Amino acid sequence: MASKIRWRLPEGVDELLPPKALQVEKLRRRLIDLYVSSGYQFIIPPLLELSETLGGEAHEELQEYAFTFKDELTGKNLSIRPDISEQASRIDAYRLDSNDTVKLCYVGDVVKRKVSKILRSRATIQAGAEIFGDSSIDADVESINLMIESLQSLGLEGLTLSLGHAGLVSIVLERFKGFGESKLRDLESALSRKSVSDINSLLSEEKDQSNRNLLISLCKLYGGEEVIDKARTDLKVLGSEAIECLDYLKELIKSLDLDKKVKLHLDLGEIQGFRYHNGVVFSAYIESAGYSLSKGGRYDGLRRLDNVPRPAVGFDLDLLAVVSFTQLDI
């Protein structure tokens, strides 16, 4: 019994053994080669960050997920990164300091204080690619196409691409900002789970049910392209800003040249893992997984360059999750 305790790993942490360790390494190399050949520069950000600078405009949210401790050398608080995409945005804004379009890619370990409810994992290997300084729809299209190509290159078949718009969700949730942070988080959680019963319970004491009905509408607005037209009716009270989000999704779909093997799914109530996205959001699934293998979206303004919000879009994937579903002979 004592010997088992000596080598037991922390909850939510695993180690890679043969042959899986080599399989993951081969997939990692394949991704780096794909990204570099596509015009992205490879970076290796540090595992540790100063807590006070972690996350930029999303500092508080990232800190919720980060393991933090005091540095005995300096006395400052340090955090283990829970996400690499925000590190890429820091490198773009403060190390590269370019007004031009910058494309960065990475593969590395991330550790989260909060355990994933799906994978029960707090430590994984995150791979991704980001585009900075380009606010065009072309950048969104490129990011989505590269995400799909990434998964296909890793031997995943039967992909479904899910599209949503964080701006649309934000417009609806803005109507509940007077409820306090805790209740707002509960509403976000209920929306992400599409739990109409929880939304009704959380808002049972509200006399004006119009806002509740909008939230419930978001829960139900998923499916094929027809969802966009239905949303124009169900969400028309939100005004022109919401219509612009829907128009953008319509234009984006037309611009995407999707492989016939990739199914398209709209989910207008989708909420990503981190809440710093503020434009189009996207994710990729396979039926056998039951959860997204890759997520991404637009997150303009996470960092600022010369006090000007820096446009950004990108995606990341969980390499340890992907290796379980690859069809490659590795």
What are these regions (language model features)?
Residues 42, 158, 180-181, 260:
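Residue-level detector of short coil/turn "hinge" positions at structural boundaries
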